[in-house]
Amino acid sequence: TRFEPVAIVAQSYALPGAFSAEELWNRVIAGADLLGPVPERRWRVDPARLLAAELAVTTLDRVTSLRGGYVRGFDDRFDPSGFSLPAAEIHGLDPLFKLVFHTAREAFLGVRGGPALRARTGLVLANLSFPSSGLSHFAEQVWSGVPARNRIDARNRFSSGLPALLAARALDLGLADRAFALDAACASSLYAVKLACDALQDGEADLMLAAAVSRADDLFIHMGFTALKALSPTGRSRPFHHEADGLVPAEGAGCVALRRLGDAVRDGERILAVIRGIGLGNDGRGHGLLAPAEEGQVKAMSAAYASAGLAPEDIGLLECHATGTRVGDAVEIRSTSRVFGAHTVPAGSVVHVNGDPTNRW
């Protein structure tokens, strides 16, 4: 079955160093480094106490780098008023919730036919199932015996799926009860877009918000990737580079508003891009998260181009995963080379935020 084209008609972002696509582009063009040290008091412990100089750490409570991509100044931009939830309630929620609220609202307001479509609007959220800062804080309060009446909002316990439902309800979306979140690791945002497109193509919705957020407990992330020996000890993101030594965690959120292309054209929407095909794959019983299967990537890319009615030679720009881990990058180079063959295409990394995102093959 041919993929019915879907238009991206609005977008919104809250990213390290940028709160819009234009700001991010300008930062990239300027070669700005959007990575930096962990914000003060973010970890609730002196980061210097946790830093291990060597990668081969012998305990699980150390980190090999204190750098990451952090959204700074968000509280000055986020307005908790105007939602169907009281501002006081929103104030007590973890920043992860607020990032989703903010980007979903901005994307919805960017749709020209938004108000008329509200009753037929849904939301899908890509959100990794890691503990948030709020969940960690709540757990600390429980363990330390803080009375229930004095604890932070208990909804912070549910930082994986609840943000999608609360955001949809806060925006009074007609399909709010169908809003959901998903975790497909690094492919989560692509799955969110695919499932949002499915809802449009099946006639279940007329407008879909496909959102993604990364705002887990940053100490948990740094320790976890250190234990996996996947965290860059130099704190530098260097995808497809011979000196790449791991990934650098970053936080942020984004949301795109999607409509069927024919409807978007009819209603005079501003069309930012058109999705003509999507390919998905799963490694199944593979080697693990840090050792993706080459064959699975080849099948996913081939399926995407087939559903779009395109050939690899038709592609002018390729955005790669390219985390900066040597095994993962090597697999991606091989799979992409198999799909594109002799066709040379400019390539960049969608996760590279230190100001040098374009790598040409």
Identify the role of each PLM range.
Residues 2-361:
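Condensing-enzyme catalytic core of the thiolase-fold
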